[in-house]
Amino acid sequence: MVIKLYGSAMSTARVLVTLLEKELPYEHILVDISKGDQNKEEYLKLQPFGKVPVLDDNGFIMYESRAICRYLARKYDSGTKLIPDVDDHEAYGRFEQGCSIEYSYFAAAAETLGTELVIKKYKGLGEPDMTRVAQAEADFDKVFFEYDKILAKQKYLTGDEISLVDLFHLPNASALKAFGYQGTFEKYPNVNRWFSGLQARETWIKATAEAR
């Protein structure tokens, strides 16, 4: 059976790019958040928290985008190798460390900026908290400062081969570039080279076109 991916817009982009890198056939099923599809009883049977995306792999149901990507990378040998072998302890340790940094430091800062500067305005939730914005901008800059040192020595964040750690950054970092933070990327030449390369990958171009 073909893998089914439930979601809407950019919520599915992280999983889509992983499916495309792994060269896996899939069916993309729209969940229209604007119409409240995520709160319907049928969908809540798949994702009890009412969030997107959800993966159905021949009856095996998973949610949370990063967990889905890890599952796909571990299960399927096709396409790009995106996760190290668990018996390569140092490589796997670097991989898990990179995943944790992306989620705890980078995504946390990026999502705070998105909430304060975009979502609040869109949903009519008042003015942005500029104290939170300033702290998130400082945190974002710190991550790129450290990344630039790493990327001066290697092509990707965990070595010279691409991994999920790199792909995990694509949705939030692309949004930051689009919403006025291009200068932060350009401030760090190794980061800018790395991320420009990620955005130019055919799989990401296809994923973003499909996720719109």
UniProtKB/Swiss-Prot annotation:
The keyword Ribonucleoprotein does not apply. The keyword Calcium does not apply. It is an enzyme of class 2 (transferase). PROSITE patterns: GST_CTER, GST_NTER. CDD domains: GST_N_Phi. Its EC number is 2.5.1.18. Pfam families: GST_C (PF00043), GST_N (PF02798). One of its GO terms (biological process) is glutathione metabolic process. Keywords: Transferase. Residues 1-80 form the GST N-terminal domain. It catalyses: RX + glutathione = an S-substituted glutathione + a halide anion + H(+). InterPro entries: Glutathione-S-Trfase_C-like, Glutathione-S-Trfase_C_sf, Glutathione_S-Trfase, Glutathione_S-Trfase_N, GST_C, Thioredoxin-like_sf. Glutathione binds at residues 51-52, 64-65. Pathway: Secondary metabolite biosynthesis. One of its GO terms (cellular component) is cytoplasm. Residues 88-212 form the GST C-terminal domain. Hypothemycin is an antifungal agent that exhibits excellent activity against Peronophythora litchii, which could be helpful for the storage of harvest litchi fruit. Hypothemycin is a strong inhibitor of a subset of MAP kinases such as human ERK2. It can therefore be used as an anti-cancer drug thanks to its inhibitory activity of Ras-mediated cellular signals. It can also inhibit Trypanosoma brucei kinase TbCLK1 which is a good candidate as a therapeutic target for African trypanosomiasis. Finally, hypothemycin also has inhibitor activity of T cell activation. Glutathione S-transferase; part of the gene cluster that mediates the biosynthesis of hypothemycin, a resorcylic acid lactone (RAL) that irreversibly inhibits a subset of protein kinases with a conserved cysteine in the ATP binding site such as human ERK2. The first step is performed by both PKSs hmp3 and hmp8 and leads to the production of 7',8'-dehydrozearalenol (DHZ). The highly reducing PKS hpm8 synthesizes the reduced hexaketide (7S,11S,2E,8E)-7,11-dihydroxy-dodeca-2,8-dienoate, which is transferred downstream to the non-reducing PKS hpm3. PANTHER family: GLUTATHIONE S-TRANSFERASE RHO. This is Glutathione S-transferase hmp2.
